Regions:
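Helicase motor core with emphasis on the C-terminal RecA-like subdomain
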Residues: 1-154, 159-162, 187-191, 196-199
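Cys/His-rich short segments
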Residues: 163, 168-210
């Protein structure tokens, strides 16, 4: 049985967001020369993080909708042609990007929905090689996202909150990430241990992100 949703070559990991910048620099340096995408929610964070990586000797560029089209196109080409290793982006990046050998996708901020998470992490390992999907989680980020929703139409707020709750329970769960993700898409994952997510490799007490 082959599941259309199961990306068996992707490793899913959630970390509490205590010292994310430091963790990201270490993570990338351990994978020198490999291609990766880092997603942030705000353009400001995209710029800051790209600068921080450059200052730490990592070839990185920013990408977001606030940049002019030419700069965006150039930065995208530099990433595709491997003149840089890392693109730090808002979710505007990746639509129609086909780079098969992206080795990791990092979410600096928790995505607004599991569907978004699945789509964005799915940009790793399209060549069938390994892909590491690392997400940083803190409850502060959730509160920030909830604040963003205020002022939107009530129905939209309700849907947004539900989607966010699903992401929170995924992040805080100690169950197999793959099982939870597939269940969300209406599929059951038969194995009790996928061997390819943080919860299966290092079973741990519940992450309490403060």
């Amino acid at each position: 049985f082959k599941s259309p949703f199961n990306r068996s070559n992707l490793f899913y990991e959630i970390r509490p967001k205590h010292n994310a910048e430091h963790d990201i620099i270490r993570f990338i340096k351990q994978r020198a020369g490999k291609s990766g995408i880092i997603y942030c929610l705000s353009r400001k964070k995209v710029e800051e993080l790209a600068e921080l990586l450059l200052a730490n000797g990592i070839k990185a560029l920013a990408y977001h909708a606030g940049m002019d089209a030419q700069t965006r196109a150039n930065n995208q080409d530099d990433f595709l042609m491997e003149r840089v290793d890392v693109i730090v982006a808002t979710i505007a990046f990746g639509m129609g990007i086909d780079k098969p050998d992206v080795r990791y996708v990092i979410h600096y901020d928790i995505p607004k929905s599991l569907e978004g998470y699945y789509q964005e992490t799915g940009r790793a390992g399209r060549d069938g090689g390994e892909g590491h999907c690392l997400t940083f989680y803190s409850y502060k980020d959730i509160q920030k996202l909830e604040k963003f929703m205020q002022g939107k139409p009530v129905a939209e707020q309700e849907i947004g909150k539900l989607l966010l709750l699903e992401t929170v329970s995924y992040a805080e769960s100690s169950m197999c990430r793959r099982k939870t993700l597939l269940h969300y898409f209406g599929e059951e994952y038969g194995e009790s241990n996928c061997g390819c997510c943080d919860n299966c490799v290092n079973p741990k007490p519940k992450v309490d992100a403060k």
